[in-house]
Curated annotation (Swiss-Prot):
Disulfide bonds join 107-186. GO terms for biological process: phospholipase C-activating G protein-coupled receptor signaling pathway; positive regulation of arachidonate secretion; positive regulation of inositol phosphate biosynthetic process; positive regulation of MAPK cascade; regulation of blood pressure; regulation of cell population proliferation; regulation of systemic arterial blood pressure by vasopressin; symbiont entry into host cell. PANTHER family: NEUROPEPTIDE RECEPTOR-RELATED G-PROTEIN COUPLED RECEPTOR (PTHR24241), VASOPRESSIN V1B RECEPTOR (PTHR24241:SF18). Glycans are attached at residue 21. This is Vasopressin V1b receptor. Belongs to the G-protein coupled receptor 1 family. Vasopressin/oxytocin receptor subfamily. The keyword Glycoprotein applies. It is a multi-pass membrane protein. SMART domains: DUF1856. Residues 60-71, 131-151, 224-280, 339-421 are cytoplasmic. It comes from Mus musculus (Mouse). Receptor for arginine vasopressin. The activity of this receptor is mediated by G proteins which activate a phosphatidyl-inositol-calcium second messenger system. It holds the Pfam family V1R_C. It is found in: Cell membrane.
């Protein structure tokens, strides 16, 4: 007697995972809805590719001046570009041809790369958030080992994505949609009927639910730390307005009284650091908004026997499967929105140091150290003028050059403020 046939599932309209195939696969599809899918995927492909290439170009022109935050954004752009090229593009071609056109090896490779890009993009965002958590809540640890703590956080998402995507290679294969029909497609194959439900639930937990829980916890702690920081600075300001005869160092010491040891030496959070926290927070919100419909529909498709399937004409169901890819479109534009000053600076980088004489400005600004403000001399070159910005301190001892370098690495953009006048 032959063994029980394996349970099969077909790719979803999103193409990354699958939904159960409960209809006769030879009936074709809704061509009008397919045109809408193709239009959406083509738009996502253009926006995601163009936006992430622009970010890579901007950061590439920064050269060795990239901060640790820029390194995370660089790799996030690479993962999002991977989503565009290895997930959206194959699915676009697949929707155009309807059936998968390629060998069994190509089928497995496409499915592997599609999920790898999802894992890498999600975990890179998670690593970037963890870096902001360490920079805000544990600044001393970041100061002691600035580079050692950065590269493992960047390498871990790529390694985890490569490992966790391996099941796709064994689940998907090129096979006949109906035995003896001669029509081939890249389908998932499970021996047990509960296989799709278990696999979809696992991927939803690994790519969406657990990362969102960690992201929420990190930002809860970050917001709590910023709130304590603002409370301390407000109290210090009130004491100064009362006319207490205190020097800057003693005022800072009073301000840090009662704070935990990890922030007692660095009692204020710089504006640049807060800006990077805001940027990462907006990227996280965009990620949740884009991927929540996708994974909700995936879970619905395997846990509800009456859910629509891949050949359904339910427009809302089909479009929801495509929304997750919008996250890779939003990320580069969010980054450029928070760092709009980098675009003209990068484009004018090669025309630097020409024209008139530099003009020097003395500028007093709040540093990331309340009691250890450091003098920074930075410059940026524009088409016509060169501006030098000085952050001066009148009540602090000079810091060693090595310490200053560490501070700049931890703070993302540190306390440098450059502009083109």
């Amino acid at each position: 007697m032959d063994s029980e046939p394996s349970w099969t599932a077909t790719p979803s309209p999103g193409g990354t995972l699958f939904v159960p195939n409960t209809t006769t696969p030879w009936l074709g599809r809704d061509e009008e809805l397919a045109k809408v899918e193709i239009g959406i995927l083509a738009t996502v492909l253009v926006l995601a590719t163009g936006g992430n290439l622009a970010v890579l170009l901007i950061l590439g022109l920064q050269g060795h001046k990239r901060s640790r935050m820029h390194l995370f954004v660089l790799h996030l752009a690479l993962t999002d570009l991977g989503v565009a090229l290895f997930q959206v593009l194959p699915q676009l071609l697949w929707d155009i041809t309807y059936r998968f056109q390629g060998s069994d090896l190509l089928c497995r490779a496409v499915k592997y790369l599609q999920v790898l890009s999802m894992f890498a993009s999600t975990y890179m965002l998670l690593a970037m958030t963890l870096d902001r958590y360490l920079a805000v809540c544990h600044p001393l640890r970041s100061l002691q080992q600035p580079s050692q703590s950065t590269y493992p956080l960047i390498a871990a998402p790529w390694l985890l994505a490569a490992i966790l995507s391996l099941p796709q290679v064994f689940i998907f294969s090129l096979r006949e949609v109906i035995q003896g029909s001669g029509v081939l497609d890249c389908w998932a194959d499970f021996y047990f009927s509960w296989g799709p439900r278990a696999y979809i639930t696992w991927t939803t937990m690994a790519i969406f639910v657990l990362p969102v829980v960690v992201l929420t916890a990190c930002y809860g702690l970050i917001c709590h730390e910023i709130y304590k920081n603002l409370k301390v600075k407000t109290q210090a300001g009130r004491e100064e307005r009362r006319g207490w005869p205190k020097s800057s160092s003693s005022a800072a010491a009073a301000a840090t009284r009662g704070l935990p040891s990890r922030v007692s030496s660095i009692s204020t959070i710089s504006r640049a650091k807060i800006r990077t926290v805001k940027m990462t927070f907006v990227i996280v919100l965009a990620y949740i908004a884009c991927w929540a419909p996708f994974f909700s529909v995936q879970m619905w498709s395997v846990w509800d026997e009456n859910a629509p399937n891949e050949d359904s004409t339910n427009v809302a169901f089909t479009i929801s499967m495509l929304l997750g890819n919008l996250s890779s479109c939003c990320n580069p534009w969010i980054y450029m929105g928070f760092n709009s000053h980098l675009l003209p600076r990068s484009l004018s980088h090669r025309a630097c140091c020409r024209g008139s004489k530099p003009r020097v400005h003395r500028q007093l600004s709040n540093s990331s150290l309340a009691s250890r403000r450091t003098t920074l001399l930075t410059h940026t070159c524009g088409p016509s003028t060169l501006r030098l910005s000085l952050n001066l301190s009148l009540h602090a001892k000079p810091k060693p050059a090595g310490s200053l370098k560490d501070l700049e690495q931890v703070d993302g953009e540190a306390t440098m403020e450059t502009s083109i006048s």
